[in-house]
Amino acid sequence: MKYNLLNNMKINNKKLKLKLILMMITMKRLNNMNQHNIYKNRYYNKNNNLQYLNKLNTYNNKMYYFNKQLMNNMLIIDNTFNNLLKKMMMSNNILMTNLKFEHRTNSIHIKYYFYNYMNINNDELSKLYNNYMMSINNQMINLLNNDNNSLNNLMTKYYNKKVYINTYKLNYMYLDTELLSQTLTNIYNNNGLSLKSLKMIINKLPFNNDMLLSKNYVNKMNKYNLTINNNLNNNKKDLINLYTLDNKLLDLSITNNMLLGKYLVGSNIQLKGRTLNRNITRTMKMNIMKGTFNNYMYQWSKLNNLYKLNYMSTNINKTNNTFINKNGMFNIKIKLNTI
């Protein structure tokens, strides 16, 4: 009997040890999975940390007034100024985004992006057109900021604050969804937008691989840190002549690579509605996706909740425009993923 009891005790101890070993293995596996998910989220979602620094960077208008009537009046002035400036730009064949307002205590800062969508192949005509556009841009800058009768001075009378207008020229229309949607609507209004023409436009967009970009960025940063750390113990003259001696270090362009929204990674264009083509009587539906949205992570949960603040990450640019024609309505949804 004693021998049987001892055997049973040994067997039970072995079972307990096996259970403890299995529990330790599962705990280690779960910890590794959690760490892997953390690193994966950091890697794919590296731009989202900026959202927590500025909780209002997704809105086009930043203002707060204690008086609601004053706030409504400011919104009306903002909308009218936005529409007037857009009409002025369209008359000069220039596409522009909606104005982004920032109301401060003593000043108002306004910024927008614009793009010249006239493309001329002939060299002589292109030179004439470039000179013409340079003169228009200079006139616009003088109209916005420099002259005594500039828009800044005119808008200060309405706002009773100092107004600063900052313009940014984009060389490519795919860098902003509003500009891309406006170019598509121009093609739609002039020639009619078909599936073939839309695919041609999307195929011309330069898509990049986010994995290669991130690896190149990490390698450049490591090389930069190594060169700096190796030369920390040298003299000041060597540190000053560091960039002139190392030509490869000049080609790193780290600050240029740190810019957000520089490289296009993926696009999703959805069209729905009635076109101007008489042969097509029914509504048209097209959804074309190219590239990747791997780094597309929501801020708060896996589900897309429109009612939460900053539910979209900073690397996603999204627009939704609806246009009315003689046959009905036409809707364009564009989503661009940048890194």
Curated annotation (Swiss-Prot):
Protein name (record): Small ribosomal subunit protein uS3m
Keyword annotations of the record: Mitochondrion, Ribonucleoprotein, Ribosomal protein
Pfam family, one: VAR1
Matching InterPro entries: Ribosomal_uS3m_fun
GO MF entry, a single one: structural constituent of ribosome
Organism: Eremothecium gossypii (strain ATCC 10895 / CBS 109.51 / FGSC 9923 / NRRL Y-1056)
GO cellular component: mitochondrial small ribosomal subunit
Family named by the database record: Belongs to the universal ribosomal protein uS3 family.
Role: Essential for mitochondrial protein synthesis and required for the maturation of small ribosomal subunits.
Biological process according to GO: mitochondrial translation
Localization: Mitochondrion
